[in-house]
């Protein structure tokens, strides 16, 4: 079904619905927007109607007025318009599917290859490494939770900051790039909870840990299978070999299917009839530096010696996925090795820094969860032991205003009960963390405030560990 001269209702203007509604209106559709959560400012709703002709409502609208609905995969199926649509047999497209149809119909993109990356973990790291690798031979635009960047010869240039990774943000990323006359050979999009189906190469980093969406009526892993189920014939899928659900879905796909072994997944979890196409093996070298050995179908293609100064083991999924993708897209081995050996970690993703002369292990990012916080603490404790450091000052929590899926206070409470005594002091960030209790804890309203408090508390031999869920 095309999206031209239709009567459409776009549900959820909070999580990426606004750019979808604007684009559909510009394409000649009669568009209404529904502010499902009632969070959009009335002035903005008025602007959408006055400037773009998009009628907006905070209440459900009659489904019979529309040819089809467009709703996000995370919307509760008990929402009245969705209930009515099912009873009337009305078509409901996901935000991902709608964006895919818009992109496929855009002639400006006909000569540009698209890479889409989804998953639970390692999306941003995989996307960033791949952008660096591709940029050694091609012009690249990268859109991730870190921002919209143009990459050339290994150097990123910021185009725009502040976009989310909802599918609707892809439309803004494309417009902002082309407005500045940046016409890449590759667009790389990090996408939350699924894919649009327009990719020349689709990458699934991980499906675990899984979690409920749509008021816990479905699983995020099922939504992410859009990457596989909507893949274009002739395109390529690069899948985590431990994602059994995705491999099963790919059996009937007309796309080329490749797999990589997730270094964090033990062999017992692999249920493949065939061995993974790509495998990464690691070897500890002098001064605890890691050497990577990259194998394709059992044959070693290259090795790379990694830089110190960050927790390289935390990036192993990204290393193998990005390297495999780069090979598939025509990047030479020399460029891939160069990127891996020059890499020093991404800000907020287990990168080591200094804060006023004190070691800072930075693990604050949009994908941070309680398991990530545990692994970061394990790393900090090992560093403390090996380097004979002092105490650990932990900053833990969320900047809820920026991230939709926050850090559950119950999980934080359990974490502190289990590990709290291993830290001299814990600074809890975010309003919801005030419900969490610990003897050695204090509270901060934001990550910058938490870092300031930690800096004041820490001695020169201490370690500050920052694990806050936020956009960076």
Curated annotation (Swiss-Prot):
<keyword id="KW-0484">Methanogenesis</keyword>
<keyword id="KW-0067">ATP-binding</keyword>
<protein>
    <recommendedName>
        <fullName>Coenzyme F(430) synthetase</fullName>
        <ecNumber>6.4.1.9</ecNumber>
    </recommendedName>
</protein>
<dbReference type="InterPro" id="IPR036565">
    <property type="entry name" value="Mur-like_cat_sf"/>
</dbReference>
<feature type="binding site">
    <location>
        <begin position="119"/>
        <end position="125"/>
    </location>
    <ligand>
        <name>ATP</name>
    </ligand>
</feature>
<dbReference type="GO" id="GO:0015948">
    <property type="term" value="P:methanogenesis"/>
</dbReference>
<comment type="function">
    <text>Involved in the biosynthesis of the unique nickel-containing tetrapyrrole coenzyme F430, the prosthetic group of methyl-coenzyme M reductase (MCR), which plays a key role in methanogenesis and anaerobic methane oxidation. Catalyzes the activation the g-propionate side chain of 15,17(3)-seco-F430-17(3)-acid (seco-F430) for intramolecular C-C bond formation to yield the carbocyclic F ring of coenzyme F430.</text>
</comment>
<dbReference type="GO" id="GO:0016874">
    <property type="term" value="F:ligase activity"/>
</dbReference>
<keyword id="KW-0547">Nucleotide-binding</keyword>
<comment type="similarity">
    <text>Belongs to the MurCDEF family.</text>
</comment>
<dbReference type="GO" id="GO:0005524">
    <property type="term" value="F:ATP binding"/>
</dbReference>
<keyword id="KW-0436">Ligase</keyword>
<dbReference type="InterPro" id="IPR051046">
    <property type="entry name" value="MurCDEF_CellWall_CoF430Synth"/>
</dbReference>
């Amino acid at each position: 079904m095309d999206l031209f001269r239709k009567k459409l209702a776009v549900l959820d203007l909070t999580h990426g619905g606004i750019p979808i509604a604007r684009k559909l209106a510009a394409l000649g559709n009669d568009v209404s927007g529904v502010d499902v959560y009632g969070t959009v400012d009335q002035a903005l709703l008025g602007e959408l109607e006055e400037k773009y002709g998009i009628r907006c409502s905070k209440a459900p609208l009659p489904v019979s007025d529309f040819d089809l609905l467009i709703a996000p995969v995370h919307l509760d199926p008990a929402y009245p318009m969705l209930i009515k649509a099912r009873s009337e047999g009305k078509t409901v497209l996901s935000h991902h599917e709608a964006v895919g149809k818009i992109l496929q119909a855009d002639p400006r993109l006909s000569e540009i290859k698209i890479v889409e990356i989804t998953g639970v973990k390692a999306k941003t790291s995989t996307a960033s490494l791949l952008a660096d690798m591709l940029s050694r031979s091609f012009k690249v635009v990268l859109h991730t939770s870190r921002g919209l960047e143009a990459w050339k010869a290994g150097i990123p240039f910021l185009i725009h900051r502040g976009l989310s990774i909802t599918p609707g943000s892809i439309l803004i990323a494309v417009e902002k790039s082309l407005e500045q006359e940046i016409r890449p050979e590759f667009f790389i999009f990090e996408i939350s909870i699924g894919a649009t189906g327009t990719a020349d190469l689709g990458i699934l980093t991980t499906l675990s840990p899984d979690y409920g969406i749509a008021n816990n009526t479905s699983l995020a892993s099922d939504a992410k299978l859009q990457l596989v189920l909507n893949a274009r014939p002739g395109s390529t899928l690069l899948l985590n070999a431990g994602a059994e659900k995705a491999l099963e879905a790919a059996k009937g796909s007309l796309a080329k299917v490749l797999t990589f072994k997730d270094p964090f997944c033990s062999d017992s979890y692999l249920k493949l009839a065939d061995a993974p196409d790509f495998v990464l093996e690691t070897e500890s070298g002098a001064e605890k530096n890691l050497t990577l050995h990259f194998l394709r179908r059992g044959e070693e293609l290259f090795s790379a010696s990694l830089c110190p100064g960050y927790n390289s083991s935390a990036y192993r999924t990204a290393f193998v996925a990005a390297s495999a993708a780069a090979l598939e897209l025509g990047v030479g081995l020399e460029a891939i090795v160069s990127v891996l050996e020059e890499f020093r970690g991404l800000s907020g993703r287990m990168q080591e820094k200094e804060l006023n002369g004190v070691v800072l292990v930075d693990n604050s990012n949009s994908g941070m969860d309680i398991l990530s916080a545990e692994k970061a603490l394990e790393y900090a404790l090992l560093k403390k032991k090996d380097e004979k450091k002092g105490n650990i000052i932990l900053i833990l929590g969320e900047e809820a205003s920026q991230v939709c899926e926050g850090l559950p206070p119950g999980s934080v409470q359990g974490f502190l009960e289990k590990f709290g005594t291993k830290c001299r002091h814990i600074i809890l960030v975010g309003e919801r963390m005030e419900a969490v209790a610990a003897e050695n804890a204090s509270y901060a309203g934001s990550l910058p405030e938490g870092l300031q408090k930690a800096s004041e508390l820490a001695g020169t031999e201490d370690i500050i560990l920052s694990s806050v869920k936020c956009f960076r």
